[in-house]
Regions:
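Secretory/organelle targeting and membrane-embedding segments
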Residues: 1-151, 155-502
Length: 502
């Protein structure tokens, strides 16, 4: 795979928060690394009435004001912005796409572009159905030239809507040209899970039911919903986080080694994990899925006091559940996943708990030995920590634990932004780390059963938990069934902006 000679990156939603905070800072890094095509331009599209000059001035002010740039990026900012153009249009108005087509034709001679377009949908998801058809009807998908499209989550609201979207996109794009982006897969530590698993003779032989007791996957935030009340109250955290982000982390943790690490080999193994999940029955959902909603705690308001949230809302802001991957490698090993808003800290990590030795001849001075752990910290402070058994210094043979850790920050290694990696992959046409349509269908097929159960059984408990705590106590009961407890990086009601030690 290689860069095309020329390419236009067309961003819908160019005046929005995602473009300002994530896309433009990532694109500057790619520009400075000289990893753009030889002839490359960015065309921002939104309703705001900018010109090329005023849009560049807006971006420059925003990027400087919010401190997104390094010293080197500040020095090259004007050079980068010279590749940025703007077309005022309404993505919801199909007639304005002809204006975009005319603009791209106008710019094509300057950039030697023969119709190579990469479209990025940084828009509200309600426009996802409309935009592909409008692109087609305005002649923007005509040959010659490559045509690719990047779509942010959520890709669908449920199985039916996801299948409808897949059908719409398949009518206008090849599957290999549809890039359903999940920024978790662009994170260095997530990709490193596969290297640790399949490239290490220490972990590869023991990564199975014979040596692993249980696995935790946590992805929580210390903020509420902010200004997203209108969207979030109709979605909830199961749709917003579990169906996509946590499922990807589960798949990478549990997948078999692909026969070949390419766009199909990797994603085929992801699908196999989804298909191996223990089927959900009503009883299983009752016993193994906990949902919650944050209430006022300390100095934080409750969910129902948030802007644009119904005062009697039953929307989930916390979900914990126990899953099983029913295959040869993982039979009987519980995977505990949880995600929530208004937690004590922001952290995403995977904790692999290994089984204790079959006979313990050494005692702990205090407490009991829980077994060794491998902690994979995805954000913040990306790194890996291994807790292993070690003799306590002094007389006797008392057992304790020692921590061996690696942090990218401590070794001055730049992990890079997830959007940098994923944008680079889309530029060269590598969809390996993007979600395939069949994975979307499999994931929604699984979680639709939980959503349907909640809809049919409105009496299903929605447990309140004070903002700033680790969620409802019922989630602790869920994991305590395996004589276990959640791995919490810090205590309840920690309101510091500082991240917790790995």
């Amino acid at each position: 795979m290689s860069l095309p000679h020329s390419l236009f990156l067309v961003i819908f939603g160019a005046s929005g928060d995602l473009t300002r905070r994530k896309l433009m800072p990532a694109l500057i890094k790619i520009h400075n690394g000289k990893r753009f095509p030889e002839h490359f331009a960015i065309i921002g599209c939104a309703r705001t009435a900018y010109t090329d000059e005023t849009y560049r001035a807006y971006l420059k002010e925003e990027l400087i004001k919010f401190g997104f740039l390094t010293k080197e990026e500040m020095e090259t900012l004007d050079d980068f912005l010279s590749t940025v153009h703007y077309q005022s249009m309404d993505p919801a108005d199909e007639t304005t796409y002809f204006l975009l087509n005319d603009r791209l034709k106008e710019l094509s001679p300057q950039y030697e572009n023969n119709g190579n377009y990469l479209f990025y949908l940084a828009t509200p998801h309600l426009l996802y159905e409309l935009i592909p058809k409008c692109l087609h009807d305005a002649g923007l998908l005509k040959k010659p030239g490559l045509k690719r499209i990047i779509v942010e989550k959520p890709f669908g609201y449920d199985l039916a809507s996801a299948q409808k979207l897949n059908k719409i996109y398949a009518a206008y794009f090849k599957e290999e040209d549809i890039y359903r982006i999940d920024h978790f897969l662009g994170k260095e530590t997530v990709q490193n899970i596969m290297v640790t698993r399949f490239g290490s003779t220490i972990y590869e032989p023991i990564w199975n039911r014979n040596y692993i007791d249980y696995v935790e996957i946590t992805a929580v935030e210390n903020m509420g919903i902010g200004t997203r009340g209108g969207y979030y109250d109709g979605a909830g955290v199961l749709r917003d986080m579990v169906q996509n982000h946590l499922m990807q982390l589960l798949a990478i943790t549990a997948m078999e080694p692909p026969a070949k690490f390419d766009k199909n080999g990797f994603r085929n193994e992801v699908i196999k994990v989804y298909q191996s999940l223990r089927p959900l029955t009503d009883k299983y959902i009752r016993d193994n899925v906990i949902r919650g909603q944050y209430i006022a705690g300390d100095d934080r308001i409750g969910y129902r006091e948030e802007k644009n949230v119904r005062p009697d809302s039953r929307t989930d802001t916390y979900v914990a559940m126990c899953l099983y991957v029913d295959n040869w490698r993982w039979q009987g090993v519980p995977f505990y996943i949880r995600t929530g808003k208004q937690m004590p800290t922001k952290v995403t990590e995977i904790v692999v708990h290994f089984k204790p030795a079959p006979m313990q001849m050494f005692q702990m001075k205090e407490g009991f030995y829980k077994g060794e752990e491998l902690i994979i910290r995805i954000q913040p402070d990306e790194g890996i920590l291994q807790r292993i058994a070690m003799k306590e210094p002094g007389a006797g043979f008392y057992m304790g634990t020692m921590e061996m850790d690696f942090s990218y920050d401590q070794h001055d290694q730049e992990t890079g932004d997830a959007y940098v990696r994923l944008l680079e992959d889309s530029l060269v046409g590598d969809p390996t780390l993007f979600t395939r349509s069949d994975a979307v269908d499999e994931s929604w097929t699984y979680f639709d059963k939980i959503l349907d159960y909640w809809k049919k059984h409105p009496e299903t408990p929605l447990y309140g938990y004070p903002a700033g705590t680790w969620g409802p106590k019922e989630a602790d009961v869920l994991i305590n069934r395996s004589h276990s407890e959640w791995t919490n990086p810090c205590k309840n009601l920690t309101h510091s902006n500082l991240y917790c030690k790995l």
